[in-house]
């Protein structure tokens, strides 16, 4: 389970996916499978959470990694490149953004 902690020195990645309600569940299932079967087993993975809005038009993925390079290496694996091509067909687009924890209240 992700924990947002002041002083976390790892890499936080928040990815938003935009889709239609017609593809929302299929996309969520693909993301859940990717985490269960591949991502959580990658070096440097700390934790992640998947969230869907009530209109089923957006998914937000919050993930934590020990280092930026660990996240980038996961994206470059053959398995994730193949999975991301499929994921891309189920959404209008997705955008991963790297963040640093600045404050926790």
Annotated model-derived regions:
Residues 11-18, 47-77:
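Short, well-ordered beta-strand segments in beta-rich or mixed alpha/beta enzyme
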